[in-house]
Amino acid sequence: METTIGILGTGRMGVRLAQMFARNGQRVILGSRDLDRAHRIATGLALEMLTAGSYEAAANADVILPAMFLRDGLLETLEPLRHYFDNKVYIDISNPFNDTYTDFILPWDTSGAEQIQQQFPNARVVGAFKNVWWEVFDAPTFGEGVSDVFVVSDDAEAKAMVLNLVENTPFRYIDAGRLANARTIERMTLLSGELGQRYGYFPRMNYKLLGEPWTVGQRDRVAHLIASHPTT
C-alpha cells in the first residue's frame, strides 16, 4: 500500500525532504500557506511523485512532516489542523533554535519533540532529521562515510514505520531510543552548528557513530592496574 507524506513548509528543510522522499518513490504533498510558492517549487523540482497543495492537503496525508521553526509559531500554525493528527505518524524535525542559532528557546528539561507530543497527545510523534543540516541532503556522504540520522520515539510501531519509509534513502538511520532523547540530539545539533562555523564546515557537516564489536565480558586491558588501586 502506497504511503503519502505531507510536508508542511517550503523552506530549506521542507524542500530537501520533499525531494528526498519523492526520489525514493513515496508520494509527497508539499504544503504551503502560499499555494503559488508551493506550485513553483514543485514544478521546479519536476518529480513525478511530488505535488503541491495547502497545509490542509498535506495534513491529510498518511504521514505528516511539518518543516517549520518553533520560534516562528509552529505549534500555533498547527493548532487549527490538530484533528488531522489523531493516530497519525508525525515526523518531527524541529530544533528549538533562537533567532541567532546560539541557544534554544526551550529549557533543558524538554525538547521540541516532547512539546509537540504534549500539544498533540494523539499524534504518534517520531523525531528524525534533527541532526541534519539542509546542505547535507544534497550529498549525505563525506569521503566513505554516510551521514547518520538519529530516530527517536516512544511509539515503537510508529518508529518502525518511519524506518521502513526511509530505508532506501541515502542516510544511515540510528534507532536512538525514547522521545526524551531528542533533548540530547537537539543540543548536539546546536553544538555541530557552532563547531561547523568555527572550522569552516557549516552547513556541510553531520554526525556519524563509529565503533567496533565488543564481546560481552571481555576484560579491560588495564583492569588489573585499576583493581590494584581501588581507591583512585
Task: State where each predicted segment sits.
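Rossmann-like NAD(P)-binding element
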Residues: 46-89, 93-100
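Rossmann-fold NAD(P)-binding glycine/threonine-rich loop
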Residues: 94-135, 139-141
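General beta-strand structural signal in soluble alpha/beta enzymes
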Residues: 51, 124-128, 174-176
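NAD(P)+-binding Rossmann beta1-loop-alpha1 motif at the extreme N-terminus of oxidoreductases
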Residues: 1-44
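Active-site-lining helix/loop region of Rossmann-like oxidoreductase modules
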Residues: 147-232
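Phosphate-coordination loops involved in phosphoryl transfer and adenosine-cofactor binding
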Residues: 1-4, 87, 146
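A glycine-biased structural micro-motif
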Residues: 39, 60, 86-87, 122-125
